UniProtKB/Swiss-Prot annotation:
GO terms for cellular component: extracellular region; secretory granule. Residues 1-18 form the signal peptide. CDD domains: Tryp_SPc. GO terms for biological process: proteolysis. The active site is at H65 (charge relay system), D110 (charge relay system), S204 (charge relay system). Glycosylated. Contains 8.5% of hexoses, 5.8% of hexosamines and 0.8% of sialic acids. SUPFAM superfamilies: Trypsin-like serine proteases. Degrades alpha chain of fibrinogen (FGA), and has strong caseinolytic activity. Cleaves oxidized insulin B-chain at '40-Tyr-|-Leu-41', '48-Phe-|-Phe-49' and '49-Phe-|-Tyr-50', and glucagon at the bonds '62-Tyr-|-Ser-63', 66-Leu-|-Asp-67' and '78-Leu-|-Met-79' bonds. Residues 19-24 form a propeptide. This is Alpha-fibrinogenase. It comes from Macrovipera lebetinus (Levantine viper).
Amino acid sequence: MVLIRVLANLVMLHLSYGEKSSELVIGGRPCNINQHRSLALLYNSSGFLCGGTLINQQWVLSAAHCDMENMQIYLGLHNFSLPNMDQKRRVAEEKFFCLSNKSYTKWDKDIMLIKLNRRVKTSTHIAPLSLPSNPPRLRSVCRIMGWGSITSPRETLPYVPHCANIMILRYWVCRAIYGSLPAKSRTLCAGVPRRRIGSCLGDSGGPLICNGQIQGIASWGSDPCVNHGAPGVYTKVFDYNDWIQSIIAGNTAATCPP
């Protein structure tokens, strides 16, 4: 009953959505119901919306800037107006950040690891996604997904998550467009040159999936979204593998790479 009430609130949020949220897929298509079994929705009653990725039965990976009070985490969700029988709602038992004060920048440490209050079982619409065994190759075709806005600057939230394929680009492409980026960072630059395809408001924290592994976390991009085909910036998960695995193993004092 609680889950039904919350989903009703989410539907109302879509009907009345104004000018708030955090990053959605522009230029994509509705995901197939079985294409996003690891995708999590992070939500609270104020209407803050983000994505996340289930990486094992009790842990979700998202972006640090997606942290919110009274966070609710939905797994196995496809259509806001038509609940799946196996979808689950969880809350955060603990949240971990690279720095204790949750300090991050547009090019560094925008990563959050969430321990769920209860485990979830693999089911028809729920399954964890593997961490990367290697960094993604240049020009790899990867998939993004989320419930973010499908239009920009005016925001339009979909009832089902949207998916799109984008490409890993050279880091200097993002650096040339976003002059504030340093010479090196633990991020990935991804998009489709000269095409308006990419993440937008409400997609932040969601996955960049390459060859069945989570390689990136949607972090930030242009405003309006994918303006003139501008690529997005994604936290490079491979660089944080050791930190993630250490935290999950119980070493809560583990530190992120410098």
